[in-house]
Every structure is written in C-alpha cells, then in structure tokens.
A protein has these predicted regions:
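Hard-cation-handling environments
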Residues: 60-192, 247
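Short, conserved loop/helix-junction motifs that constitute active-site signature segments
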Residues: 30-34, 101-103, 173-178, 210, ...
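Short beta->alpha connector loops
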Residues: 17-20, 45, 160-163, 174, ...
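A short, acidic, amphipathic alpha-helical segment used as a generic capping/interface helix at domain edges
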Residues: 61, 165-174, 224-239
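Long, charged, low-complexity intrinsically disordered regions
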Residues: 142-145, 186, 198-208
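His/Asp/Glu-rich metal-coordinating catalytic cores
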Residues: 1-86, 90-104
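Structural motif
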Residues: 10-11, 37, 154, 181, ...
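Generic long, charged, amphipathic alpha-helical segments
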Residues: 204-235
C-alpha cells in the first residue's frame, strides 16, 4: 500500500503462479485483494499453451517411465523449491524405479545442498527415502563419486536451466554416452545451456571443453510453475483491479 495524505493506493504482485499446482512446501495461490494496479505474470499467455494437467501429466509419466526402462543414467535438472518435490512424487507414483538392479531398486540421487535442506524441512510430509531408494547428496566429494560412476541411476540436481549448480558437473559425464538421457521439466531462457540442449545442440561448451551431446533428450510439459492461458484468464477475470500490467511474457 502507498499512502499519500488521505489517499491510499494498493499495488498487487502475483509472482509466478499455477492454479493447478499442488505442493506441501508452497502454499496454493490466493486471489489478490482489491488493488488499484495489479502486476501479473503471463509467461504462457499463448492460447496454444493450453493443456490438461491430468491428461498431459499422464503422457509425461509415460515418458519418464520409458526413459527409466531404456537408459542407464538419467539426469533431471530441477529447481530446488517445489520442482524437486514434484519430480520425486511422479517418480514414486510411476513405480518405474522399483525395477531391480542387482536386487536393489534403482537409486535416486538428490544432488543439491539447497534441495536437500528443503527436503529435510518437509521430510515427514515427503518421506521418499524408503519409497524411492532416495539418497540425499550434500557433500561435493559424494557428488563427484556419483558423477564418475557408471551405475544405473536417476540424478535430480539443480539448476533447472543449467546456468549453475551440480547438474552442470553431471552433464560432462551424462551427455557423451548414448545410453544416458536428460529429462527437462521446466522453462529454459534462450540464453541458457538448457535452452541450447533442448533445441538440439549436438555439442556444448562446458568449462572450456567441447562436450559431444549423444544422450537422449526429453522435454516434460506439465511441471511448469507458470499458469497456462486458460488459468491466466480465469485468475485475472476473478480479481478486482483498476489496471492490469502484464509482465514476463513470451
């Protein structure tokens, strides 16, 4: 609120939102109160971005299941807050990781110190360590050992756009091998490494070294934290404002 004399003006900011997203670590979006100006996101404002969460999530789950069955090592770059939780939930519900390797479930490595701290904060609600054979990797030494291993595994690491984080270190070992796969689960800005790989780059520059991209690349469509066209229209039609300023648009 901005007060000037007896006049009070209210500006509201939506931030990123998805009206269908469910999470134990992020509260559902609530309608803004009456505002003079609303500054709202419209990342996926193109009507062609519409999708059915239930139907299209099923397709994503089938894609994940097929990748786990077919490939040796799978890297899933992910944002530490909420996205990691969504991925772990889908891995558990698809039951794909229950396939046995040497009598054990396929291990799922959560290789991100921040994501591990968030997971521990919500461990009672999430509880995937036994369900998924989930292993929390916090030290750099543990991460290096996993990077250089050739065991069958699923690695969930930040960052989602590959502009920082341990996912970059894993890429060096994942990409050259055609028996490996990378599963992207979110938006990638045009100036990011994730964008290059998603759009077919056959080689990338990483730490001054040219790395061949022989891995299989998958793009999942239903993990975004941004509302699609229909959700945006419904949300903005149901809040009260004098002026709407749309930002963060395609």
């Amino acid at each position: 609120e901005i007060k000037q004399g007896y006049s009070i003006k209210r500006i509201g900011f939506t931030g990123d939102f998805n009206t269908e997203a469910k999470s134990v670590s992020v509260s559902p979006i609530e309608p803004l109160p009456r505002c003079n100006v609303v500054v709202g996101e419209c990342t996926y404002s193109d009507p062609t971005r519409c999708y059915s969460m239930k139907k299209d999530r099923w397709y994503d789950e089938q894609m994940i299941n097929a990748a786990i069955c077919q490939y040796n090592r799978i890297l899933m770059p992910a944002f530490s807050l909420q996205r990691v939780e969504d991925i772990l939930d889908v891995l558990w519900r698809t039951r794909a990781t229950e396939r046995k390797v040497d009598g054990q479930m396929i291990p799922v490595y959560l290789d991100s110190p921040l994501a591990c701290r968030i997971y521990r904060a919500w461990s009672e609600q999430l509880d995937y360590e036994d369900k998924l054979n989930l292993r929390l990797i916090e030290s750099w030494e543990e991460s290096q050992a996993i990077q250089q291993s050739n065991e069958r595994a699923i690695i969930v690491a930040s960052s989602g756009m590959l502009n920082a984080g341990r996912a970059l270190a894993h890429l060096k070992y994942i990409l050259p091998n055609s028996r490996n796969a990378v599963l992207f689960s979110g938006y990638a800005s045009p100036n990011t490494l994730a964008y290059e790989i998603k759009h077919g780059a056959k080689e990338i520059m990483l730490d001054g070294e040219m790395i061949q991209n022989n891995a299989q690349i998958y793009c999942l469509n239903t993990f975004s934290s941004h509302a699609n066209y229909n959700q945006l229209m419904q949300y903005y039609q149901n809040i009260d404002y004098d002026k709407l300023c749309l930002v963060h648009s395609e």
